[in-house]
Every structure is written in structure tokens, then in C-alpha cells.
Amino acid sequence: MEGSVLTLVLLAALVVCGSWGLNEEERLIRHLFEEKAYNKELRPAAHKESVEISLALTLSNLISLKEVEETLTTNVWIEQGWTDSRLQWDAEDFGNISVLRLPADMVWLPEIVLENNNDGSFQISYSCNVLIYPSGSVYWLPPAIFRSSCPISVTYFPFDWQNCSLKFSSLKYTTKEITLSLKQAEEDGRSYPVEWIIIDPEGFTENGEWEIVHRPARVNVDPSVPLDSPNRQDVTFYLIIRRKPLFYVINILVPCVLISFMINLVFYLPADCGEKTSMAISVLLAQSVFLLLISKRLPATSMAIPLIGKFLLFGMVLVTMVVVICVIVLNIHFRTPSTHVLSEPVKKLFLETLPEILHMSRPAEDGPSPGTLIRRSSSLGYISKAEEYFSLKSRSDLMFEKQSERHGLARRLTTARRPPAGSEQAQQELFSELKPAVDGANFIVNHMKDQNNYNEEKDCWNRVARTVDRLCLFVVTPIMVVGTAWIFLQGAYNQPPPQPFPGDPFSYLEKDKRFI
């Protein structure tokens, strides 16, 4: 029974204490906003005094950088602090309340906006509570996803780096009314400005495409702008980021280079296959497709040509030249002696000088082999014997010799009457009989000579075409290698600056604090 009574007493005490604390907070709010007649539309300063606003930026995630839209999307916490003397209280008079949490729309706000936003939303979309301390210090840490404008330099894509910024200022108050500054932090009793974008290692998500190189912060004041202009001052947070090119190297760069180097294989194709021009045009079409893909990935700007675009244009010009060369080679290959004459200087240059320089194998000189000489000598012996046989046989015997034997007739025992071999009549008869055969043989020989000369000169044209092919191979390949290396080495030497700002040796990092 006593235990139950004790429990009830404790519960009642807790309820009383809770209601007492709640009443103290309500009393404090009533004191600040009703008794003091707090007006959130008025600045917390005298007429000629300026309210100092301190800013700091904590980066949670670099979400993306869309090159086509030139938009940087970041997830940040924008930290704002100022002093409002109208919100001061004595903690002992209000139950030692050390901090008061109120909705942001209940107090005066400096209206700090992102100037270079890219979506039309200048203000913070989510307004969290503000923290108010007895000294009148107001602390506000709203989260935000900003889409800021970031001019893209496409000159060295995909080996590029970009300098993006988030520019904050007040479009409502001038420099006379508020003063923007960076947040002051303390270490070992000494204060220093936070001149960098804060990154929490535990809460930061690394981007897979971009690497942060520098992240400085600066207060910019333009002396040429009047004091009563809101554009005189701003706080700018810079993000100097470098692209991780591995994705583009594997998916775009290597295929482009391999396809471009395939054009050298055109010179190895024989002209008779009829595929030289088709292969060159196929490579040209493949390069055009890659160029179209890249154009959709980058902003439509005429300020510069991206590095990979330069390579593709260089390759397309080279492939176009190869197509022209292929047409010329095919024209030379299919030339004939009936349409073109191969001059001696051209023959000497393309059949003797250049093949030796290009280490081309030359066909062996045509010459009679020993077997051919033996066959020719044996043929001459047969021809002489045939002539002797024909001189002794009459035409009727030559035509009906076997037929007379089949009819049982005796062979002629006497030889055909012929005039004496040395007589003029015999020579005339022999000449008249052999002349048609000799004329026919001469015709065949002359025709074969003409055909051989025709084929030989046509083969010379073919060899000239092969020499031109080899010469172009030795010219195009070094041009392709040197041009590719020269273009992409520009990207290899394109590195971000060692310091964020030219001429300023300060690194703007946590390790190099500038104590005040």
C-alpha cells in the first residue's frame, strides 16, 4: 500500500515539474513576443547600425553536375547566425532556459538567398526551427537542395575540371543594413574564420563522377557598387571539382580510338575484293554516331570544341581522305592499256624506287626455265621430222593410207612422184603448202605476244595500285598515332590549379587556419 502511494506521489511530482517547465517556456515566449511587442518585420538594430550575418556551408552530397543544363545540384546545410537584441532574457528569471526553439517564421530573418540558382527558387524550401540563446544570438541551420548555375568549360572533356560556385546574398537589405561575413570558430581560445566549405566525413556521400579539389569560401565586396545596393556584397562558396574520366575512357574514348585505327586496315584489303570503300565509309558512319552521342552529353556552346570532339573531327577528316584514296587506288587498279598508258617515269617510281623504299616484295623476272628449253628443243625435232615425212608422202596417201589397207589393197611399193628436192618447182610447191601454216603460226604468236604485253601492262597498273596502298598506309598510320597522342596529351596536362585563387598562396583548408 505504501509503495503505491509513493508511486503516485512521484508521478504527481513529475507532472508538476513538467507543467512548471512548460509554463516557464510559455512565459518566456509571451515575454519576448507580447510584452516586448516583438515585430519580425523590423531589423534587430538601430537605424544607422548594421546587423552582422555570419554564414557557413556544410556539404552533405554533391548530387550531380548536368553539363547540358549547366546546373550543379548539391545537398547542403546553410548555417546562419546573427544577434537580435530584442530576443535577450535572463535565464534565471525563466527557469534557467538556455535555448529557445521557435519556428523560423516567428522571428526576423536576413532573407539570404542563392543568387545563381538555376530553378527559379531563390529561398530555402524547408524552414526548420531557429535556436535562440539568452544573449540574443540566433542560430539557424536549414537544409536545402540547391540547383545552382555552373558555367561549363568543355575544352578538355572528358579530362576537364570545373569551377562552380554558390553565391549567397540578401536581395532585401543593403550593405548599410546588414553585413555579411564568414562564420567565426574557436580553437584553443583563438578565433578564426571558416574560409572553406565544411564537409562532415561521416555524413558526406562521395560523387562517382566528380572529385572535389578545392572548396574555398570568400566574402566579396565590390567597391564600385553603391552602398545602398544589395549587389555590393555577397558570400561565395566555391567548388573546384575534377572529373573522374574512367567511365568515359572505357565507354567512349577506347571504342572511338579502336574504330578510328581500323581505317588502316583498308590499305590491307585487296582492290579486287570490292570492300575497300565500304569499310572506310562504315568507319566514317561509326565516328558520326559517336560524335552525335557526345553532342547530346555536352551543352550547345560555340565557345570551345571538346577534346574528344577534336579527335573525332580529326578522325573523320582522315577517314574522308582515305575514302578519296580508295577511289583513286581502285581507279588505278582497274586501268588497262587500252584506256591508259603507263609512262616510264611512273613505272620507275612506283615499280622500282618506292617498292624498294617500302620493302615491298617484287615479282621475279620472267625467264625461260631449263625444262622449257628442253621442251622447246624436243618440239623442234618433232617439227623437222614431220616436215620430212610430209615431203615424202602424197596428199592421197596421207588422207587414205589406212583406208586402203582396210580394203585389202597392197601398200604402195613406190614412193610418190615428186620433183627433185633441189628443183625450183619443188620449193614453190613446198612454200605454197607451208605458207598458210606459217601465217597461222605467226598470227598465233603475235596474238600471244600482244596478249602477254597487255596482261603485263595491266599487272603493272595493279602493282602501282598496291604501291599507292602501301605508301598511304605508311603515311596515314603515323599521322593517326601522332594526332591521337597530341590531342589526348592536352587533356593529361590539364590539371586544376594548386591553389584556389591565382596569386593567393592561401590553401583555404582546415589545416591552414588564419587565426584572428
From Swiss-Prot:
Glycans are attached at N96, N163. CDD domains: LGIC_TM_nAChR. The modification Phosphotyrosine is found at Y389. GO terms for biological process: acetylcholine receptor signaling pathway; chemical synaptic transmission; membrane depolarization; monoatomic ion transmembrane transport; musculoskeletal movement; skeletal muscle tissue growth. It comes from the Eukaryota. Coiled coil: none annotated. Residues 333-470 are cytoplasmic. GO terms for molecular function: acetylcholine binding; acetylcholine receptor activity; acetylcholine-gated monoatomic cation-selective channel activity; excitatory extracellular ligand-gated monoatomic ion channel activity; transmitter-gated monoatomic ion channel activity involved in regulation of postsynaptic membrane potential. It is found in: Postsynaptic cell membrane; Cell membrane. Residues 1-21 form the signal peptide. It catalyses: K(+)(in) = K(+)(out); Na(+)(in) = Na(+)(out). Keywords: Cell membrane, Disulfide bond, Glycoprotein, Ion channel, Ion transport, Ligand-gated ion channel, Membrane, Phosphoprotein, Postsynaptic cell membrane, Receptor, Signal, Synapse, Transmembrane, Transmembrane helix, Transport. Pfam families: Neur_chan_LBD, Neur_chan_memb. Its main location: membrane. GO terms for cellular component: acetylcholine-gated channel complex; neuromuscular junction; neuron projection; plasma membrane; postsynaptic specialization membrane; synapse. It is a multi-pass membrane protein. Residues 22-244 are extracellular. The chain crosses the membrane at residues 245-269, 279-296, 311-332, 471-493. Pentamer of two alpha chains, and one each of the beta, delta, and gamma (in immature muscle) or epsilon (in mature muscle) chains. The muscle heteropentamer composed of alpha-1, beta-1, delta, epsilon subunits interacts with the alpha-conotoxin ImII. After binding acetylcholine, the AChR responds by an extensive change in conformation that affects all subunits and leads to opening of an ion-conducting channel across the plasma membrane. Belongs to the ligand-gated ion channel (TC 1.A.9) family. Acetylcholine receptor (TC 1.A.9.1) subfamily. Delta/CHRND sub-subfamily. This is Acetylcholine receptor subunit delta. It comes from Bos taurus. The gene is CHRND.
